[in-house]
C-alpha cells in the first residue's frame, strides 16, 4: 500500500517507487521530487503520464514547451525525451509508466502535451461520483487513461472493472475493501486493482469529498464499472 523501500537520491532529485511493475501488468507508478535544475523523463519503450502533486515548473519535448502547476498532467510518449525544469520551490511529480504490451485504443482526437485538471470536462461515474479525464484516446494517450476522481462521503456497492488500474490518494481518510481484506487510505497511499477484482472504495469522511488519481489500461472510460454480488 505504501512505499516500502528506500528512495534513490541524487543531487537534484529523489525518486520513490510507489507501485512496482509486475509481470502481468503494463502499469507502474513512481514519484519524483525535483529539488533543483532539471529532471529528464525518457522511457525508450514505455509511455509516461505525469501528474504534478505540488510546485511549479515547465516541461519541454523537442520544440514544444508548456508550464506545469499543481493539478496539471503531461503525456510523454515512448522514445521521447522530456525535460522538466523547476520553478519556485520543490516540484513533486507522479510518473505512471505504461508498457508496450498494453492494447492501444484508436485515437479520438489530436495529441496534447500538458493539460490542467480544471480545464478537463467533468463526467458522472457510479452514483454521485464524478471524474475528470486528463489523458486518454481523446488527446493522445492510446494505451492508458489518466483521471482525477471525486468520491463523496460513503461507499459504492461491490463492483469491479475490466481494466488494470493503479490508484493514488492525495488526501484521506478512506478505505479500500476487497473480498478478503481491508486497507486504510491515507495521504500518499497507492495501490493496484487488477481486472475483475471486486472491491469497494470508501470515503470515510462525514463531510468532505475524497479525491483520487487513477490510471488504467486499456484506455477507456473510468465510469465502466460492473456490479458484483453483495
Predicted regions: what they are:
Residues 78-103, 142, 186-187, 195-222:
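Ligand-binding loop in jelly-roll beta-barrel domains
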Residues 44-59, 148-152, 160-176, 215-217:
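Short, conserved beta-strand element in jelly-roll/cupin
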Residues 63-81, 180-196:
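Short acidic-glycine-tyrosine-enriched beta hairpin
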Residues 130-163:
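A mid-sequence, solvent-exposed acidic-amphipathic segment
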Residues 23-25, 60-64, 87, 152, ...:
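Short strand-coil-strand connectors
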Residues 1-40, 69, 89-143, 226-230:
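A short, N-terminal "cap"/entry segment at the start of jelly-roll beta-barrel domains
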Residues 38-44, 85-86, 155-161, 202-204:
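Short histidine-centered beta-strand/loop micro-motifs
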